[in-house]
Amino acid sequence: MSLQNIIETAFENRADITPTTVTPEVKEAVLETIRQLDSGKLRVAERLGVGEWKVNEWAKKAVLLSFRIQDNEVLNDGVNKYFDKVPTKFADWSEDEFKNAGFRAVPGAVARRGSFVAKNVVLMPSYVNIGAYVDEGAMVDTWATVGSCAQIGKNVHLSGGVGIGGVLEPLQAAPTIIEDNCFIGARSEIVEGVIVEEGSVISMGVFIGQSTKIFDRTTGEIYQGRVPAGSVVVSGSMPSKDGSHSLYCAVIVKRVDAQTRAKTSVNELLRGI
C-alpha cells in the first residue's frame, strides 16, 4: 500500500486514532510524510503555472493526523519550555546542518518540524507553521507568520507583522499561496486560500480573504480569491448599491510587468496612486 493510500484510509477513521490506538503502519506513514514535507521532497501544493496549483490533499491530511498520533510533551529550546505535540524544525540541529540548509534563522525565529525552508531564506523573529513551504531567497520579516501549509514563492518579501493564513484551523480546501517575486506590505493579511500571483505588490495594511472584492480600477473588473499577476494593490472601499454606506475592498491601482518590477523600487510603484 502506498504512503498516500495509507494516509487516505487512516483519515477516514481519524476519530478512532489516538497515540495509544494508532497502528505502527499508520504512525510510520504519517511521520514519513512529515519528514518529506520537512525536507521539501513533498509539498502540500505544487505549482502548474501562474495562478495554477495542484493541492496534495493527502499531505494535508497527514499533517492533521500527526496531531492525533502524538501526545503533548515538554519542548525546550534552551531558553524557554513549551508543551506541544510538534517539535521545532531545528531543535536538535548542529552547525553543519544549518550550513547545509543554507538559510538564516535569527534569535526569536520559530519554524515547526514539517515546514520547509529553502536556501538563502532569512527568518527574522517570525513563525513558520507545519506544512508550510518557504522558497529560495524569501524574507520572512519580524513578527510575520506563515500559516500551516502556506506556500511562499522565491524572492518573496513578507514585511513586518504580515499574516499568511493557514488551512488547518478552520480547515480550508486550498492553502494560501504567495507566488514568486511578490512583496507583501507590513501588517497585511492574506488568508483563506487566496492566491497572490507572481510579481504582485501588496501595500501596507491590506486584508484579503475569499470574500474580499478586489477591484481593478483600470478595467472595472472585480476579482475574488486571487490577485492577478503583476498587480499593485492598496486598501480601499466600494459604495453600496444605494449609496448609503461603503464596504472594505482591495484596489488594483496599476499593473506592472517583470521588467518594470525589476527596475522600480516598491516605494516608487506605490507613489502617485
Curated annotation (Swiss-Prot):
Binding site for substrate: 104, 141
Keyword field: Acyltransferase, Amino-acid biosynthesis, Cytoplasm, Diaminopimelate biosynthesis, Lysine biosynthesis, Repeat, Transferase
Pathway: Amino-acid biosynthesis; L-lysine biosynthesis via DAP pathway; LL-2,6-diaminopimelate from (S)-tetrahydrodipicolinate (succinylase route): step 1/3
Localization in the cell: Cytoplasm
Pfam families from the UniProt entry: Hexapep_2, THDPS_N_2
A Gene Ontology term for the protein's cellular component: cytoplasm
Presence of the UniProt keyword Repeat in the record: yes
CDD domains: LbH_THP_succinylT
Recorded family membership: Belongs to the transferase hexapeptide repeat family.
Name under which the protein is recorded: 2,3,4,5-tetrahydropyridine-2,6-dicarboxylate N-succinyltransferase
Organism (species): Neisseria meningitidis serogroup B (strain ATCC BAA-335 / MC58)
